[in-house]
């Protein structure tokens, strides 16, 4: 019996490239043995609703084609359900943090090859209050860059748009008083930023979590304490090389459960999109989603040795 795949795609991502190549993508998957159909989103929330519908119709594979926001919506549509379908990813956004972390090719046909080859691995996801995320949750003024950067600027200069907007915001940054409880520990004090990471790639920084494991059941918690502009600039430079973890203004920890609160009105960034405001409870859901990935992520030590799946090893 042929497997059934449903593509959920954002037609505006990647300068509408996927929309143009959709017929070729459908043919490629059909030739590989998948009975395939597609759905184009029109507004925020569409991908979640369509993922839920596809679950009810018992699709074997869901393929998210778009940016990290589209992928986040698809995950939110299946995370609470039993017998979740395998997830394929076609990175079409500006940064594509999750795709980078899993070494998924940025070209459409290359990403489809990963799905067709059939290797998959189970990865952790995060639950924040009543919603889910697959890559990061963050707070602090600088973390608003991804959803405050104009779409036109992103279409012109791509990922560099975030750096342009980020440097524009640096002088305006202010520390806020936070209480962060994590696995029996407490941080109470002023901080500029905090990140909860599930992969090594966050906000375009591919070495922000140099020791990342995608399936160990832990968030990486990064807190940047109150710093002056020069210190913050130095931390960002170190972060581009993965050398920030020992900086005296950086707290770098692992935790399964985290609670964050503040008397300040602080917005959250969840997988690159606006995620509401504090307070927030975070829980790591270990190995919750099965994702198609290239076989080489095992060699990159992104998967825990005791969790290597049989279908991620060449026979």
Swiss-Prot record:
Binding site for ATP: 10-14, 41, 67-73, 94
GO BP annotations listed: phospholipid biosynthetic process
E.C. number: 2.7.1.107
GO cellular component: a single term: plasma membrane
Keywords: ATP-binding, Kinase, Lipid biosynthesis, Lipid metabolism, Magnesium, Metal-binding, Nucleotide-binding, Phospholipid biosynthesis, Phospholipid metabolism, Transferase
Cofactor(s) essential for the protein: Mg(2+)
Ranges where the DAGKc domain occurs: 1-132
Pfam families: DAGK_cat (PF00781), YegS_C (PF19279)
The record's free-text note on cofactor binding: Binds 1 Mg(2+) ion per subunit. This ion appears to have a structural role and is required for catalytic activity.
Residues where Mg(2+) binds: 213, 216, 218
Molecular function in Gene Ontology: ATP binding; ATP-dependent diacylglycerol kinase activity; metal ion binding
Gene3D superfamilies from the UniProt entry: 2.60.200.40, Probable inorganic polyphosphate/atp-NAD kinase, domain 1 (3.40.50.10330)
InterPro entries, alphabetized: ATP-NAD_kinase_N, Diacylglycerol/lipid_kinase, Diacylglycerol_kinase_cat_dom, Lipid_Phosphate_FormReg, NAD/diacylglycerol_kinase_sf, YegS/DAGK_C
Enzyme class label: transferase
Active site, renumbered: 273
Catalytic reactions of this protein: a 1,2-diacyl-sn-glycerol + ATP = a 1,2-diacyl-sn-glycero-3-phosphate + ADP + H(+)
Record family assignment: Belongs to the diacylglycerol/lipid kinase family.
Functional note: Catalyzes the phosphorylation of diacylglycerol (DAG) into phosphatidic acid. Is a key enzyme involved in the production of lipoteichoic acid by reintroducing DAG formed from the breakdown of membrane phospholipids into the phosphatidylglycerol biosynthetic pathway.
Subunit structure: Homodimer.
Protein name: Diacylglycerol kinase
